[in-house]
Amino acid sequence: MSDGNDFAELLWENGQAVVHGRKKHPQPAFPPFGFFGGTGGGGGGSSSRAQERQPGGIDAFAKVGGGFGALGMAPAVHDFASGFGATTQDNGDDDTVPWIHYPIIDDEDAAAPAALAAADYGSDFFSELQAAAAAAAAAAPPTDLASLPASNHNGATNNRNAPVATTTTREPSKESHGGLSVPTTRAEPQPQPQLAAAKLPRSSGSGGGEGVMNFSLFSRPAVLARATLESAQRTQGTDNKASNVTASNRVESTVVQTASGPRSAPAFADQRAAAWPPQPKEMPFASTAAAPMAPAVNLHHEMGRDRAGRTMPVHKTEARKAPEATVATSSVCSGNGAGSDELWRQQKRKCQAQAECSASQDDDLDDEPGVLRKSGTRSTKRSRTAEVHNLSERRRRDRINEKMRALQELIPNCNKIDKASMLDEAIEYLKTLQLQVQMMSMGTGLCIPPMLLPTAMQHLQIPPMAHFPHLGMGLGYGMGVFDMSNTGALQMPPMPGAHFPCPMIPGASPQGLGIPGTSTMPMFGVPGQTIPSSASSVPPFASLAGLPVRPSGVPQVSGAMANMVQDQQQGIANQQQQCLNKEAIQGANPGDSQMQIIMQGDNENFRIPSSAQTKSSQFSDGTGKGTNARERDGAET
C-alpha cells in the first residue's frame, strides 16, 4: 500500500497481522485497535508515551493473550497486540523499527491478508458469512482517523494520538446472581453524536460503512454485532434518564483509552459463546436480578406487620431497592464488579442493622407481656410457698393437740377441753406435787392425809414413812400407836429441828388413827381446823422400830418387850423436856407460856397407864393366857 512517497507494510507472521508505517502517514486498511480506550482529554498522547516507556509492550499483550488462552481467545489477543505494537512503534523513532527488512506489498495485494484472515477465522464457525466478510475486507479503503468524530483530545496534531471511537463488546460473562447464570455485556455509554457517526454507516448498507467495524471478524460475527447495535438504538429511544441506568447494560459504545490499565481491558469471548442470542437472555436477567430482592422486601414488610401490629419504615424498602440497580448494572470488569458488590454488601449490612434494631425494639415490646408472665410466675411461687407454710402449721397444731391430750391423761379428774383450762389444771397439779415432795424431804415422817389434799390428789395413796415410828404418827397408814382411852389427852412435843412443829392436841385422837377419843384434834398446827372422831375405838398395838409393819396383823410381843419400849419412850421424853426447858429459859416470848404448859402436860400425862399395859399383854398372848399377865403385873407393882 502506497500513497505517493508514503507507504505501510501489512505482514502475516505466525498467525498475526503486523502493520508498519511512518509518521504522518494515513491509516492502513485495518487501523490498529487501541487496546486501552478512554474518553478523557489527552488520552491518546499519554497512552503512546506510556507505551514508549514500556519496551516490552507487545510481549505484555502477549502475556495478556496467554491469560485469556484458557478461554480460547489467545489468537484474537495476539492479533490486536500486534496492531497495538505497530501503533506504539510508529509513535516512536522509526529508525529503531526493523520494518525495512520486510518486502513491500502493493495496493492490489493488500486485500490478500484480509481474505486469508477471514478464511482462517470464519471457516470454523459461520461458513455462510465467509464470502461477505472477504468482500467487506477487500472493499474496505484506507480510512483516515480525521474522518471520525474525535472527543476530548488534547489538541495534538497527530491523528493517531486521538481517541478512536470503536464499537467494542466485552466478554458475555456468566455472572451468577443467586445461582442464576446469565450472559451479560458491559460497555461505557457514549455521546449520541459519536454513536450515530459510528453506527449509521453500518446500517446504511454502503460498502464504505464496513470500515467502521474494525476487526469485526476477529471479535464476533457480523450478525451479533448488528443485533447489539439495534438493541442499543432501541434502548436509547425508549428509556429515559431515570431508567437509563438499568438499560445501558445491554450494549454500549466505548472510547478505549490506553492509560486506563489492564483492568479495563476488553475481554473477547470465544466465538461460540458470542453466537448466543443476547437479547432474549438479557431481558430475563433484568427481571431475575430484581426477583431475589422482592422476597426480601416482602419479608421485612411481613416482619413489620407481624410484630406488635406495626409496619416497617419506608426507608428500609428504599434501602433494599438501591442494590437492585447496582446488580442490574454490574459489569464484567473486575473493578466495577468489585465496587458494585461492595456497595451491595454495605447496603445489605445497613438493612440487617436496621432490622436488628427494629427486632430489639419489638423484643422490648414483647417483654411487657413477659413481665406479666414473670409476675404470674412469682404469684404462683408465692401461693405455693403459702401452701407449704399452711401445711407445716397444720402439722404443728396437730402435734400440739396430741401433746395436750397426753397431758390431760396425766392430770387426774381433768375433763377440760380448752387448752387454757388444761394448762391451769396442770399448774395446780404440779404445785401439789412439789409441796408433797418438800414434806417428804423434811424427814419427819409426817404425811398429809387425803382430806387435806386437793380434789385432784385425793385418790393418791402416799406410802407410810418409817423414819420416826416411835412418835406414833403413823396416821392410820400401818404405824399403830398405843391406846390412850383412859387419858384425856395425848400431847406430843414438837420435834427438834422440824420444819412443821405440831403441838400436842389434848384429849382427842383422830379418826382411823387407832387413838380412841371423843374430842377433836387440830392438825399440823393449823388453829381451828379439827377432825371429828366418831368411830369406835380400835384396840391399840405396839410398834417396834425397825420391825416390819403390817396393818392387818397385830405384832406378838412379850411383857419384857413392852417394858423395854416403855423405858425407851420415857428416856426420849425426858431428853425432849430438857431441851425444851433450855429453849424456854434462853428466849422468853409470848409463846413461852404455851410451851411451858405443853411441857407440864408432857411431864404429867406422857406415861403409859397400867390398863394399857394389861391390854397389850392380853393381845400379845393371843391364846387366852391373860391371867398370867395380870398376875405378873401385880407382882411387879
UniProtKB/Swiss-Prot annotation:
Residues 149-170, 608-621 have a biased composition (Polar residues). SMART domains: HLH. Its main location: nucleus. Residues 35-54, 146-213, 356-397, 601-637 are annotated as: Disordered. It is found in: Nucleus. Residues 384-397, 628-637 have a biased composition (Basic and acidic residues). Residues 35-46 have a biased composition (Gly residues). Induction: Down-regulated by light in dark-grown etiolated seedlings. Belongs to the bHLH protein family. Transcription factor that may act as negative regulator of phyB-dependent light signal transduction. This is Transcription factor PHYTOCHROME INTERACTING FACTOR-LIKE 15. It comes from Oryza sativa subsp. japonica.
